[in-house]
Every structure is written in structure tokens, then in C-alpha cells.
Swiss-Prot record:
Role, per record: Participates in electron transfer between P700 and the cytochrome b6-f complex in photosystem I.
Positions annotated to bind Cu cation: 95, 140, 143, 148
Keywords carried by this UniProt record: Chloroplast, Copper, Electron transport, Membrane, Metal-binding, Plastid, Thylakoid, Transit peptide, Transport
PROSITE patterns: COPPER_BLUE
GO cellular component annotations of the record: chloroplast thylakoid lumen; chloroplast thylakoid membrane
Organism: Hordeum vulgare (Barley)
Protein name, per record: Plastocyanin, chloroplastic
Disulfide bonds: none
Length: 155
């Protein structure tokens, strides 16, 4: 029986290698890389869809319309229970969002969902998540008399 007492491994060096042209068509290389990009995009989209599937969507509401009109925009909308509603001061007038205690589902504490402090700067926001199904009436305290009132239906 023969025994191996030592072995040598030779690793070639590529430091002095000269570039070789590939015999593959550049069109094939482009197609292959586009295929990889498409596959990566599909994976990213699927991952995004899974993330969105587990989280609630959002509803944005402007406090004041473009042009300075004192309204909620939109002023009548629906959301699913657990979706976030973000109210955004659009023009810089002082606005707030007060839920009317006589116009919300029974048992809802309006002090926990209202923003009674004024949002005074353009871009300031207030977000609320409503979880009890029903209809909620809300208004802007300083501008309710001018018609700045709204309604959200939670399904």
C-alpha cells in the first residue's frame, strides 16, 4: 500500500494575465443582467406587498384647501378600523381637529382622539388611529362657523 507523505498544490496567479474577449454575445449578457434585475424587482415588490399587507393604510386630510378656503379636504371619507388618519396644516392658519362627543360611537373618549392644540405652521400634522367602527363627526374649533367640519366613517 502506498502512503502519501506530502502534497503540493499550485495556485495560478492572475496578476499578469492579459484580458480575453468573451466569445459570448453582449446581447446575451444584457439579457441575463436584465433578467436578474427583473427577478430582483419582483422579489422587492413581493416583500413590499407583504409588509403592506400587515400594516394599515393611511388617509391624509388637509386642514384648509389650496387657495385659503377653510375646509377639511376631503371632508367626508371612510377608513377601515385601525387605519391612520393624518391631518396636515395646508396654509398656516391656526387649525385643530376636535371630535364631537355627540357625533362619535358610544364609548369613544373624544379627549383621546382630538387635537385641541392649534397646528399653526404649514406642514404641521396630527395623526389619529380610530379602531371603533361607526361615524365620527369632527370640526376645527376656530373655523367651524365658516363650515370647517368633517365626517369619517370607520368600517
Amino acid at each position: 500500500m502506498a502512503a502519501l507523505s506530502s502534497a503540493a498544490v499550485s495556485v495560478p496567479s492572475f496578476a499578469a494575465a492579459t484580458p480575453m474577449r468573451s466569445s459570448r454575445s453582449s446581447r446575451m449578457v444584457v439579457r441575463a443582467s436584465l433578467g436578474k434585475k427583473a427577478a430582483s424587482a419582483a422579489v422587492a415588490m413581493a416583500a413590499g406587498a407583504m409588509l403592506l399587507g400587515g400594516s394599515a393604510m393611511a388617509q391624509d386630510v388637509l386642514l384648509g384647501a389650496n387657495g385659503g378656503v377653510l375646509v377639511f379636504e376631503p371632508n367626508d371619507f371612510s377608513v377601515k378600523a385601525g387605519e391612520t388618519i393624518t391631518f396636515k396644516n395646508n396654509a398656516g392658519y391656526p387649525h385643530n381637529v376636535v371630535f364631537d362627543e355627540d357625533a362619535v360611537p358610544s364609548g369613544v373618549d373624544v379627549s383621546k382622539i382630538s387635537q385641541e392644540e392649534y397646528l399653526t405652521a404649514p406642514g404641521e400634522t396630527f395623526s389619529v388611529t380610530l379602531t371603533v367602527p361607526g361615524t365620527y363627526g369632527f370640526y376645527c374649533e376656530p373655523h367651524a362657523g365658516a363650515g370647517m367640519v368633517g365626517k369619517v366613517t370607520v368600517n
